[in-house]
């Protein structure tokens, strides 16, 4: 017989640096999930990734206190900042100076990496979503 799902929890954890301190510890602890077991499993699963990369993770926990987790691709904003070589977006997007610029080729590479996590039918739709995110961060799309 299948385990009964008690709930799901969505967190964003930096790759290779899950630890029991807030916000991870309290979020897992109040649901009865073994915090250290999750931290060890997550860090092992992300050891090949760039340390510090934000990874969205969906944790499904069961009534017997066991859990499974699924990792997704880093957020679009992370990829945009990395490609544009900036630390943060514009404080006033759409007005004044641009925070940086990206080419259509860079947007396409991000879209291909994020395609399975996006709600887009094709690569052009995914590129349009990512261009919108770039404009919202004050980035200019050229080419």
From Swiss-Prot:
Keywords assigned: Methylation, Ribonucleoprotein, Ribosomal protein, RNA-binding, rRNA-binding
Entry's Gene Ontology cellular component terms: cytosolic large ribosomal subunit
Entry PTM: One or more lysine residues are methylated.
Family matches, as SUPFAM superfamilies: Ribosomal L11/L12e N-terminal domain (SSF54747), Ribosomal protein L11, C-terminal domain (SSF46906)
Molecular function as annotated in GO: large ribosomal subunit rRNA binding; structural constituent of ribosome
Classification via InterPro entries: Ribosomal_uL11, Ribosomal_uL11_bac-typ, Ribosomal_uL11_C, Ribosomal_uL11_C_sf, Ribosomal_uL11_N, Ribosomal_uL11_N_sf
Pfam families: Ribosomal_L11, Ribosomal_L11_N
A biological process from GO: translation
The family this protein is said to belong to: Belongs to the universal ribosomal protein uL11 family.
Cross-referenced HAMAP family: Ribosomal_uL11 (MF_00736)
Subunit field text: Part of the ribosomal stalk of the 50S ribosomal subunit. Interacts with L10 and the large rRNA to form the base of the stalk. L10 forms an elongated spine to which L12 dimers bind in a sequential fashion forming a multimeric L10(L12)X complex.
Role noted for this protein: Forms part of the ribosomal stalk which helps the ribosome interact with GTP-bound translation factors.
Protein name: Large ribosomal subunit protein uL11
Lineage, opening ranks: Bacteria, Pseudomonadati, Pseudomonadota, Alphaproteobacteria, Hyphomicrobiales
Gene from which the chain derives: rplK
């Amino acid at each position: 017989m299948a385990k009964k799902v008690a709930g799901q929890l969505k967190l964003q954890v930096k790759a290779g640096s899950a630890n029991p301190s807030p916000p991870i510890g309290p979020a897992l602890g109040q649901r009865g999930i073994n915090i250290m077991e999750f931290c060890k499993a997550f860090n092992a699963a992300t050891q090949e990734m760039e340390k510090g990369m934000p990874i969205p993770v969906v944790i499904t926990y069961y009534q017997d206190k066991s859990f499974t987790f699924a990792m997704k691709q880093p957020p679009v904003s992370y990829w945009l900042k990395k490609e544009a070589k900036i630390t943060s977006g514009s404080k006033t997007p759409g007005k004044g100076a641009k925070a940086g610029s990206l080419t259509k080729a860079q947007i396409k590479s991000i879209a291909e990496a994020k395609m399975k996590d996006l709600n887009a039918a094709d690569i052009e739709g995914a590129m349009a979503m990512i261009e919108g995110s770039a404009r919202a961060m004050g980035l200019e799309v050229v080419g």
